[in-house]
Amino acid sequence: TLLDKVNESLIRETQAHGGVILLVDGFEDVLAVKSLSGDFPPPYGLPEDLPHKAIRVETNFRFAQFPLNETIFGAVACSGRGELITEPLSDSRIVQNGPEDFLRCGSYIFIPLKIKETVIGVAAVARRYGEAAFSDKEYRIASTLSDYASAAIKLIYSHQEVMEYAELTKEGDIACKLQSTLPPKLLPSVPGLSLGAFQRIADGICGDY
């Protein structure tokens, strides 16, 4: 998918060991993981009952959703500002989940994905514990790539909106034709009465015709 390709590009160009992309779900006010690749120690608190096994942790992360007011991902989405984390052990926003090597947090870069000034998601890359921290240069690379990613995502969203609108218009035309068949073609003749039928179709009334 597009997001997987963007994720791989971010990992490659910043020489990271793993990357993740999350998008905002506006209906539920959460960030949902859409792409996860490589080694990315989760910077959020794992569920207490989750076994510290690599495959179990990865699965938990891959299908995770985070409220916008929680985790470093939510903080970046809400502020609209990127973060370069070079000292995770002294950063209260980064949760250390355990002594296992694959859980030990190293350096991170978090970048908000924006369409104009609206944050639509967060992209992040990570390096393993003990490896050299990300530099300002790599932060700038991640920021530039994320800008391109946001533009590509915007094109996809715009295309989807056009297709959805076309489908709704088609359904509306069908509803309009059906409604036009409702008025009777002929009215009964009643002595002393003048009968007639009139119909005006309107759309957008409670989401229907």
Question: Which residue stretches match the model-derived regions?
Answer:
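A short, aliphatic-rich beta-strand micro-motif
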Residues: 106-114
